[in-house]
C-alpha cells in the first residue's frame, strides 16, 4: 500500500502472516486443526482399512466391497456438500458433517458383524468425511480476506498434509497395540470429534461477533 503525505511517499508493506496470527488467529487455528484431524482420519482409514478388516476375518469379496464403497461415498458426498454450501451456512454444513461422521464411527463399532449395515455406514462415512474435507478449503477462502488468503490457505494445506502422513503411519501402531475392530472405530471417532469441535467453536465465535456488531449498529 502506497500513501502520499505532504509530497513524501510512505510505503506500508502488506504482511499476510501478521494478519493471520493476529486478527485471524483463532479461526486459523480452528481451521488448521480441523483439517489436520480430518486428513489424519481419512488417510488412516483408507490406507489401513483393507488390512485391518482382513485380520478380523473379512473375505476378499467383502474387502473389495468396502474398499469401493468408501471412495464412492466420498464422490457423492462432495457433490452433495457443495450443493448445501451454496444454499446454507458453509461452516454449519461442514460442522454437521463431522458430527454425523463421529456418531457413525461410534455406531460402526457396534455393527461390524452385520455386513449390510456395516457397508451402508462405510459408504455414509466416506461421503461425510471426504465431502467435509473437500469443502474445508473453499470455507478457508471465504474466511480469509484477499490480503492474506493465499498464505492462510497454504498454511492450512501444509498442516493438513502432516495429518495425512501421520494417519498413514498410525496403522502400524494399531497393530502393535492389537486393538479389536470396535476399539479401532472408537479411536477414529476421537479425531473426528475434534474436527467437529474446532468448527463448532469457530462458528460460535463468529455468531458472537455478528451479534456484537448488530448491537453496535442498533445502538448507533
Question: What are these model-predicted stretches?
Answer:
Residues 175-191:
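A membrane-interface helix-boundary motif in multi-pass transporters
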Amino acid at each position: 500500500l502506497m500513501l502520499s503525505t505532504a509530497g513524501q511517499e510512505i510505503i506500508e508493506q502488506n504482511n499476510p502472516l501478521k494478519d493471520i496470527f493476529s486478527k485471524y488467529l483463532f479461526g486459523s487455528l480452528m481451521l488448521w486443526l480441523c483439517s489436520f484431524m480430518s486428513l489424519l482420519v481419512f488417510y488412516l482409514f483408507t490406507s489401513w482399512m483393507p488390512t485391518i478388516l482382513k485380520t478380523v476375518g473379512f473375505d476378499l469379496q467383502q474387502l473389495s466391497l468396502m474398499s469401493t464403497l468408501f471412495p464412492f461415498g466420498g464422490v457423492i458426498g462432495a457433490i452433495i456438500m457443495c450443493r448445501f454450501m451454496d444454499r446454507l451456512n458453509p461452516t454449519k454444513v461442514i460442522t454437521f458433517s463431522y458430527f454425523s461422521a463421529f456418531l457413525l464411527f461410534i455406531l460402526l463399532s457396534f455393527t461390524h458383524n452385520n455386513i449390510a449395515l456395516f457397508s451402508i455406514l462405510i459408504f455414509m462415512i466416506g461421503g461425510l468425511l471426504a465431502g467435509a474435507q473437500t469443502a474445508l478449503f473453499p470455507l478457508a477462502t471465504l474466511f480469509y480476506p484477499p490480503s492474506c488468503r493465499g498464505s492462510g490457505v497454504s498454511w492450512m494445506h501444509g498442516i493438513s498434509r502432516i495429518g495425512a502422513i501421520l494417519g498413514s503411519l498410525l496403522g502400524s501402531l494399531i497393530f502393535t497395540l492389537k486393538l479389536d475392530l470396535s476399539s479401532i472405530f472408537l479411536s477414529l471417532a476421537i479425531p473426528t470429534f475434534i474436527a467437529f469441535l474446532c468448527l463448532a467453536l469457530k462458528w460460535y465465535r463468529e455468531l458472537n461477533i455478528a451479534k456484537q456488531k448488530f448491537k453496535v449498529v442498533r445502538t448507533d
